[in-house]
């Protein structure tokens, strides 16, 4: 056991999906995995391990934001030996050619979080995806007939920004979407020498104001789940 994860040694697979919402973790496990076993209920952050097309896969909720995902990613890698981490989450679209429910593969992530400023003594660090995972997910999505968008995302430290126009500066530089975890995931993957990728579904749009319901976000964004799982079995 680690501080925040109740699993015993060997209960978590080397490849894991990381939804922010623990109920999405439950949905993925019950919908896609064979013989899923719940290994974690600590703080309601559900975690499961099962098999997908013969490969052992885990899925673990992480909560929202850089501090929360950092807790789970640190413990999964350090205490349980996880090697491949795929975040499956939602994001707000920031470009006109990106539509609600589109798939986004995050090649890199900007952030306003100070976590890396502290870590690198005021210097910048460029958090990027693992090419192996990025290519596997892109190829999988294309084979399925999807049209994934690939590019940078913005990891925000605050959901309710006091400056509602702040996102426009990032959009001006080609940023595809805003979310709250990827910069931390990619930084920790680099620190520990493991593989990480974020696959996002656009759940709302900062330009058009279109949005989806909480129920849709929990149970209907299955394209990204299928892409993540089918990419995972190629590793």
From Swiss-Prot:
One of its GO terms (molecular function) is purine-nucleoside phosphorylase activity. Its EC number is 2.4.2.1. One of its GO terms (biological process) is purine nucleoside catabolic process. One of its GO terms (cellular component) is cytosol. Keywords: Glycosyltransferase, Transferase. InterPro entries: DeoD-type, Nucleoside_phosphorylase_CS, Nucleoside_phosphorylase_d, Nucleoside_phosphorylase_sf. It comes from the Bacteria. Signal peptide: none annotated. It is an enzyme of class 2 (transferase). Disulfide bonds: none annotated. Catalyzes the reversible phosphorolytic breakdown of the N-glycosidic bond in the beta-(deoxy)ribonucleoside molecules, with the formation of the corresponding free purine bases and pentose-1-phosphate. NCBIfam families: deoD (TIGR00107), PRK05819.1 (NF004489). Homohexamer; trimer of homodimers. This is Purine nucleoside phosphorylase DeoD-type. It comes from Clostridium perfringens (strain SM101 / Type A).
């Amino acid at each position: 056991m680690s501080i925040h994860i109740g699993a015993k040694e060997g209960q978590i697979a080397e490849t894991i999906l990381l939804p922010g919402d623990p109920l999405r973790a439950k949905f993925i496990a019950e919908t896609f995995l064979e013989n899923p076993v719940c290994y974690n209920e600590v703080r309601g952050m559900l975690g499961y391990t099962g098999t997908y097309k013969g490969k052992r896969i885990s899925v673990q909720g992480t909560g929202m934001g850089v501090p929360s995902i950092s807790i789970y990613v640190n413990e999964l890698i350090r205490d349980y030996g996880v090697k491949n981490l795929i975040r499956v989450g939602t994001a707000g679209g920031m470009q006109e050619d990106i539509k609600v429910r589109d798939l986004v593969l995050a090649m890199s992530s900007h952030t306003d979080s100070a976590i890396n400023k502290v870590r690198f003594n005021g210097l910048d660090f460029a958090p990027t995806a693992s090419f192996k995972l990025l290519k596997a997910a892109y190829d999988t999505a294309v084979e399925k007939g999807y049209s994934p968008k690939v590019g940078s995302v913005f990891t925000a430290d605050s959901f309710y920004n006091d400056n509602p126009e702040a996102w426009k500066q990032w959009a001006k530089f080609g940023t595809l979407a805003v979310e709250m975890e990827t910069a931390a995931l990619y930084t920790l993957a680099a620190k520990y020498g493991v593989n990480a990728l974020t696959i996002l579904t656009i759940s709302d749009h900062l330009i058009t104001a279109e949005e989806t319901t909480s129920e849709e976000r929990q149970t209907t964004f299955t394209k990204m789940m299928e892409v993540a799982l089918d990419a995972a079995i190629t590793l």
